[in-house]
Amino acid sequence: MRKTSIMFDRDFAIGATDPRLFGAFVEHLGRCVYGGIYEPGHPSADAKGFRRDVLDLVKELRPTIIRYPGGNFVSGYNWEDGVGPKDKRPKRLDLAWFSTEPNTFGTNEFMDWCKTANVEAMMAVNLGTRGGDAARNLVEYCNHAGGTYWSDLRKSHGWPQPHNVKFWCLGNEMDGPWQMEHKTATEYGRIAAEAAKMMKWVDPTLTLAACGSTARNMPTYGRWDDEVLEHTFELIDFVSLHTYLNNYAGDTAAFLASPDVLDYFIDEVVAIADAVAARRRAHKRLMLTLDEWNVWYRTRRKRADRVKEGWPIAPAILEEIYTMEDALAFGGACICLLNHADRVKAACLAQLVNVIAPIMTETGGPAWRQTIFWPFAQMSRLGRGSVLKAKVISDTYRASYYDPRGSEDHHFPVEAAYLKTAVVADVAGGVSLFLLNRDLQQEMRVTVDARNFGRLSVKEATQLHHVDLKAINDKEVPMRVKPERLDHVEVGADGLAMTLLPASWNVIRLEP
């Protein structure tokens, strides 16, 4: 049995979690919208076509903010196509996903869905094929009370009150050559700055995020971020980054270590942003939004493969089926987000339904939870509060990692601790522990020294574990992988101790 220990003190904190840290993402991609959150005629659909069974699972998942409408999709999207009478909305070819977009679900329908789901809206604007003019018009349409062309148009469409969207993304992944009208850092920095300026002139209360590097392996990584922030620093509040964990190599130990790379990624982007601030001698600090993150690799395909399939509406693409192994790596990313709560103030799990998602549906049929549903739901429910600095003593292992996509993906940790953990305290005196045992063979004995908390008792203790790391949840067995009770958590005057199963995700809630 492997032995580890954790020590933390309630007076030593990393930072408070922002509610927007627990966000998700809805893109016009595959069956995320059509057949996902929106399916008129489904037995569970309400009068607006929203699937109630999906809404029930979304409310259980507890996301706080939803990014929309993309993603790659937004770089070619004319937002005006998705408002007004549905029978007058045009169908368009979507060059991002080689699909046909019917536009029967658009901005106003999304705002209604957000209200029904009790989540905040995060809107992205098209800075690919369009620019600042379309962006400021959309802000006026969404947020202005009335008496102008765009605000009165919203009223004529049946939404008399402004939507008051506060968080806006200035484009999507504009450093990527796969993006419609991909730009250099200077080109994007200029258009983002001008769009931001006009958007804030329409509504000075906006929070804006600029596109940082899409991934840590981008050839322009670092230089892109520095140049973009030189143009936008004074006008924005956040810089975005994206990450998708993968196991192309088929190496489970390395896969479970890969969330540590996200730790490095965040630290590096923070350093770049702070260097831009330092050159200005500015007290302002930019925050980070990890507005796309997940496990994704099996359903990645080249664009040429999708072109051959024609231009269907809502094709079943990117429908990653998640395993127990994926849930463990995903849990490691959850821990990473919590441990960077001082600077990562927003994040969006990509995506919400069907498309690389925690929730799956069958058209006309049921909805169910994927394996990754559980770590996110537990993080969102129990991860709100002050993240504490935890001293972890754990054996480490070396992860030999290979990504067949190329050597640029070899930015990997030399050593990874078998135990990855985050500790979150709340104002009521309770504390939640998130514990990932990355040892694939051995149980782990964990002792916890919780200082300045007084006597604590176990309110809740669960483990997510399956003997088959390839186990999945599906329509036939939707609860094959689910949290089970973690027994024998021993509480004493000086702390607590427990034994974790190999390859397991564990959550313990303690209260006075």
Q: What positions do the PLM features span?
A:
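Non-catalytic accessory regions flanking glycosidase/transglycosidase catalytic cores in CAZymes
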Residues: 1-224, 229-238, 262-263, 267-307, ...
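Active-site His/acidic residue clusters
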Residues: 242-257
